[in-house]
């Protein structure tokens, strides 16, 4: 059924197709096309002190402003990561800014943190009936100068803290100029120290400790990843999301879309994301959660990431190419990996 729906959706511009697909799902059309959602096995995981009903989550970027939580929670996800949100609303980059490469099950996007701002998301969560696990991914506004980036992150953390089960710090989007520089050396130390100080204050204010995770890039020069991991592990962040989209074009070099700027996601990212995941898994202690993202297109991919050491996995581009049935496939793969009936 989804193959037919996808043919129709792919006739639309990607952002329009995304909105239409979510509206159709809200009407129940896509839910009806995915039998067995409510009979999915429970695959409980306790990670970062949070009880997840299963380890399969939605990656940031799919529901930036929390507008589709009612739809997404019915698909079988164990958690939703909303955002990226910034302290102030911003339009993102000019359109077109998303490009499909169907023959490679890939996307290139240069969205640029388009979002309504943190405050509207917080209001939606405050009145939402959604009771599942929610992470919120935060970033800096594009017009905030690099020397003030830390304050943007601290402000965003303060805004979302009361409604988040965990907060993901996005330092790795390739579509905000200078953002990835925050992954390195002194800038990273300063940022993590500032956020942990702010988290301590917020924990006392809200009487709860919200885990902080950092989302990292897949693109690293020799030695850079180890240096970044040194800082993240030394500063005892609660988790690491590996990875964001890549600036590389391996596997899609001959396509017309390869000339477009932005981050590449989907199947061509699989090998690179797995390599980074493996490096992080080899370094981290068991206290540091590991969330796998990037190029997860099948249940086999889920099994592979869990084998490599991931505690949780996240889907995005796979949902666009495989549809909501991928969530079921992923959860059942996680159940089999845990030795449970699927």
Swiss-Prot record:
Keywords: Cell membrane, Flavoprotein, FMN, Membrane, Oxidoreductase, Pyrimidine biosynthesis. Its EC number is 1.3.5.2. It catalyses: (S)-dihydroorotate + a quinone = orotate + a quinol. Binds 1 FMN per subunit. GO terms for molecular function: dihydroorotate dehydrogenase (quinone) activity. Its cofactor is FMN. FMN binds at residues 60-64, 84, 137, 170, 215, 243, 266, 295, 316-317. The keyword Cell membrane applies. CDD domains: DHOD_2_like. Pfam families: DHO_dh. It is a peripheral membrane protein. Its main location: membrane. It is an enzyme of class 1 (oxidoreductase). It is found in: Cell membrane. It comes from the Bacteria. Catalyzes the conversion of dihydroorotate to orotate with quinone as electron acceptor. HAMAP family: DHO_dh_type2. Monomer. Belongs to the dihydroorotate dehydrogenase family. Type 2 subfamily. This is Dihydroorotate dehydrogenase (quinone). It comes from Halorhodospira halophila (strain DSM 244 / SL1).
